[in-house]
Regions:
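Ligand-binding loop in jelly-roll beta-barrel domains
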Residues: 70-71, 84-114
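Short histidine-centered beta-strand/loop micro-motifs
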Residues: 44-48, 66, 73, 92-95
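A short, N-terminal "cap"/entry segment at the start of jelly-roll beta-barrel domains
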Residues: 1-31, 73, 81, 117-135
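A short, acidic/glycine-rich surface segment
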Residues: 17-19, 41-44, 88-93
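Conserved hydrophobic/aromatic beta-strand scaffold that supports enzyme active sites
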Residues: 32-34, 54, 79-81, 105
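A short beta-loop-beta micro-motif enriched in histidine and acidic residues
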Residues: 27-28, 40-54
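Short acidic-glycine-tyrosine-enriched beta hairpin
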Residues: 25-29, 37-38, 61, 67-86
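Short, conserved beta-strand element in jelly-roll/cupin
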Residues: 36-37, 49-64, 103
């Protein structure tokens, strides 16, 4: 039985995101984290993940920006996906100045590797042509 057909009279199953052809590192470790951002918090500095990351905003609004893509706002009830690897994640901060935002992220990484590494100022400068124009 597929997830699309798994609903019963007492429950409902709704697929929130589907990413075909996702590359998952061999023997991947999977971590699910809850991120809570106070109002106006800019989030984690530019970084990357060694494997894909799937996320769901459960409260508030998150500013989201990946290398090569324009920044966008993801609201409560919406999802995001990152391919991981060499792609820089520039922003994941709270879009609301006075209210808390929260999201859940599931991160995949090869065994023994951190799920997040920061990007140096030198690398950001060298790759600035890959960043989408900002509003």
């Amino acid at each position: 039985m597929s997830a699309e057909n798994a609903s019963t009279p007492n429950e409902s199953v709704e697929i929130l995101a589907s990413v075909p052809g996702t590359t998952i590192p061999a023997g991947a470790e999977v971590k699910t984290v809850l991120i809570t951002l106070p109002g106006g918090n800019p989030g984690t500095p530019p970084h990357r993940h060694p494997g894909p990351a799937f996320g769901y905003v459960i409260k508030g609004e998150v500013i989201f920006e990946l290398e090569g893509e324009p920044q966008r706002v993801i609201k409560a009830g919406e999802t995001f996906w990152e391919p991981g690897g060499d792609v820089i994640h520039y922003q994941g901060g709270n879009n609301l100045p006075d209210s808390e935002s929260q999201y859940i992220a599931t991160l995949l990484a090869p065994p023994g590797q951190p799920v997040l590494t920061f990007v140096s100022e030198e690398e950001l400068e060298a790759r600035k042509d890959r960043r989408a124009p900002r509003p």
